[in-house]
């Protein structure tokens, strides 16, 4: 009763037939790939249309270097106009000591007053915006010792 029963010969036959089919299929696939390789290796020269050097197409938009030059010129013009706007006048010099006048000439301002809440020319009038970004976590899956750990937050 405790003996294991031997398999029936029918099952053996089925299995052997399936393995021979698989063997045959593998052999066919190998021969196909060889034929494909032979066909591929006929011409050693690269295809005419597929040249290794990138093709240059004439574009209507100006090249990046020209754009950069144009931007630089515009920046210079704006800087020149701003420097002309902020000239020290006689009214600014009234009631100032010699040190303050020298400081105005050097730095462009006379005192260290706070500009908080005041509109100042030339400053980028940017306001703090609360940007909520998606949290990023370190990867622990698909690496050694990864599954028994909680996800670590990357600040």
Swiss-Prot record:
The keyword Phosphoprotein applies. Residues 1-97 are annotated as: Disordered. GO terms for cellular component: nucleoplasm; nucleus; U4/U6 x U5 tri-snRNP complex. It is found in: Nucleus. It comes from the Eukaryota. Pfam families: SNRNP27. Part of a tri-snRNP complex. May play a role in mRNA splicing. Belongs to the SNUT3 family. This is U4/U6.U5 small nuclear ribonucleoprotein 27 kDa protein. It comes from Homo sapiens. The lineage of its organism: Eukaryota, Metazoa, Chordata, Craniata, Vertebrata.
């Amino acid at each position: 009763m405790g003996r294991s029963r031997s398999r029936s010969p029918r099952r053996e036959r089925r299995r052997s037939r399936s393995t021979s089919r698989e063997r045959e299929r593998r052999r066919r696939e190998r021969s196909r790939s060889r034929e494909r390789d032979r066909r591929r290796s006929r011409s050693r020269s690269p295809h005419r249309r597929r040249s290794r050097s990138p093709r240059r197409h004439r574009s209507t938009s100006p090249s990046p270097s020209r754009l950069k030059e144009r931007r630089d010129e515009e920046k210079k013009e704006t800087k020149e106009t701003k420097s002309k706007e902020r000239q020290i006048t006689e009214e600014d010099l009234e009631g100032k000591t010699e040190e303050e006048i020298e400081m105005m000439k050097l730095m462009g301002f006379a005192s260290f007053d706070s500009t908080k809440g005041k509109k100042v020319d030339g400053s980028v009038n940017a306001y703090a915006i609360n940007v909520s970004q998606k949290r990023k976590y370190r990867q622990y899956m698909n690496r050694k010792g990864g599954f028994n750990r909680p996800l670590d937050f990357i600040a």
